[in-house]
Amino acid sequence: MSGAVATLAPSRAPLRHSGADKPLLRFITCGSVDDGKSTLIGRLLYDADLAADDMLATLESDSRKHGTQGEELDFALLVDGLAAEREQGITIDVAYRYFATDKRKFIVADTPGHEQYTRNMAVGASTADVAILLVDARKGILPQTRRHSVITSMFGVRHVVVAVNKMDLVDYSEEVFRKIEQDFRDFAKHLRFTSIYVAPMVAKDGDNLVHGSTKMPWHKGPPLLTYLEGVAVEDTTRIAPFRYPVQWVNRPNLDFRGFSGFISGGNIRPGDIVRILPAGRDTRVARVVTYDGDLESGVSGQSVTLTLAEEIDVSRGDMLCSPVSPAKVGDRLEAQVLWLVREPLVVDKTYLLKIGAKITAATISTVNARIEIETGLAAPLEPGATLQFNEIGEASLSLETMIACDPFIDNRETGGFILIDRITNETAAVGMVKTVASSLGRSAPTLTDLSYASMEGVAAPAAANAPATISLGKTLAFAAAGGVATFGVVAAFGQNASLAAQIALAETGALAVLHYVFEKFWRAPQTPAAPTDETPPFTGEGL
């Protein structure tokens, strides 16, 4: 065994350090318990000469202590790093591994299959481009397989590999493989996968992982690693509208005030106009600052500090975005929710909602539907319904404050949130924004919107009561004119300004009352215009 380890060393070193200018692919392994997820990753790294010498030496030692493969190496131990994982032979936490081939860089997340660790699987899915869904050829599609499929689709993973593992235990049967393939395709037709690749394999033997299978000649597709190197995944955040959630107000001294964060979409240059949400004010970017100096531009995926041309109030949790395609602003959300704790969701209970760096109180007002794991479809629920542990539903949320966000389908970074129990501080749920609305009746109110609304609020009542308003104005003007005239006469002839003021005030009050009575009761009201059957001209109001 040690000799085999030594021969792998020369070819591994350049591979591990040769990924500087290559495209990056993030993928996860998921599926039901004991389907071989960790074994698949460990064997893939081993066969591709991507496991370092010290890792292999540790693997030999751990295989003797905790291995489940007899005298053979237990490749799952290359990935399962926690003591509890090694002792129990299961995956508990998400394990990340980084490697590169001649064609691509990879970050793989090995996620647990046990039901109680679904929250950890969701963490891995939240950033993945591709999901490798392990299926035991003997058992077929299980409930946890379906649940993980729904979760990966929910988190925006668009490419899935169905790895039908342990084919040696069904005598490499094509019939068994085809049935599992058809079962999954029938189930997944309602999910939002762009591509589904189904491949047979034996992970512990490395069959169809790096090299094509010699025992299943009926399978014509590429081995797993070849597929991963070639799958086309678009980075839509680079062409998306600019999004910049502010994580920190950077004020190291009196001469510098910047706003630090992660560019979640688009790009930014000095001189670009940005909109600050939820306030809705526009300003101009002065500098794009990093530790290594100023940049000519910042792009999606970079952490930078932006300075603005004006001294404007911007706080942690605010968002700087494109004024042409701004994020939505609102305090009402429709969202998909994955419930993560044993205690059921409580309707009308207040939780903390965290989206980016923004934290606000949120109440789940209704649970509108539950995703049925057997079908992947949403089933409507009665009012007052709730969600149990690991259930997925569609819910309506009311927020305490306005937030800026996007539908999750448009931007993962600005459309995903978590709900935190205010008593236990547990992460109770993870959610994906579907739609955003405002209790003010608009989907994205800004300062400009609110100023117009306030003007309309004053102008509309005044217009509706125009005759009364005009009458009152005439009354006050008439009375004031009389009072001023009386003051002038008395002051000039009586030489007593104090007495003149008292007489003028008394006269002003009396004249106001008399004139108002005249306008209100003696003057004939205007005859309203006769109704007409003509349709008023279209103005576009209300669109």
Label each PLM-derived region with a short phrase.
Residues 2-27, 35-38, 101-102, 253-469, ...:
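C-terminal effector/interaction modules appended to NTPase cores
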